[in-house]
Amino acid sequence: YEIPLRLVGSEMCIRDRSRVNVVLKPVAVNGPIMTIRKFPSKAIKMNDLIKMGSLTKEAAEFIRKIVRSKYNIFVSGGTGAGKTTFLNAMSDFIPKEERIITIEDNAELQIQGVENLVRLEAREANLEGEGAVTIRDLIKSALRMRPDRIIVGEVRGEETVDMISSAMLNGHSGSMSTGHANNPKDMLHRIETMMMMGIDLPLQAIQRQVASALDIIIHLGRIRDKTRKVLMIEEILGYEDGKIQTKTLYEFKEVGTENEKVKGSIMKVAELENTGKLVAAGY
């Protein structure tokens, strides 16, 4: 394999989908560093996550219904929270007859059983600064491919404008993505900030777009015993009183510890208010 070497952040995926990151001297003071991030050879399903204790059957069934009913969903969490793994598991609920387009920096998603699947991968510029294909370029291209859903592995910058304004608000309900955030409200603030990087609109107008486009945020995290959990499921209610209004539907409740393991599970704390898509889907 050949990596276009830069001082910082040279990246590539190798044949088994592992992600390789290289940092060189003098930035790496003690010498070159290569980090290899490996992924399971077999896709982790939602039932596997239930067995691991990441969420309950009830929460998984709720997620199955909102995915099949084409709610627009963001998965948030910190580094290593399992966002890509969870997005993979959620995508298994998508009806197999739909046309799905996935867009990623590095092709990590393992969507299976969908015949009409288009996978797009961004490309970095070469050492001469040419040939770059960005996530934003790919979203714009995907919109011309008649998708039923668009799944973006992760949004980090101005491409959020196209994901929110063009995909989710433009008839592609059921679209999904992930983002780094400490909690659902933080995810909303990050989405607003990233959209402001790509479009010249007042904050209020951006907030209205986000509130109209996004339905659900599922927040993941690693708790103190290092296990990964679904910590919160938040509903986006709309825009009112100068801010995006939300409602917590499910929340992780800790009940104690046993053998240094945290005991607890995600519990339902409120009913979904915006049930229109569920009703339209026959639930």
List each language-model region with its residue ranges.
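NTP-binding/hydrolysis catalytic cores, primarily Walker-type P-loop NTPases
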Residues: K226-Y283
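Walker A (P-loop) phosphate-binding loop of P-loop NTPases
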Residues: G80
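Single conserved hydrophobic/aromatic residue that forms the stacking wall/gate
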Residues: Y1-G9, I14
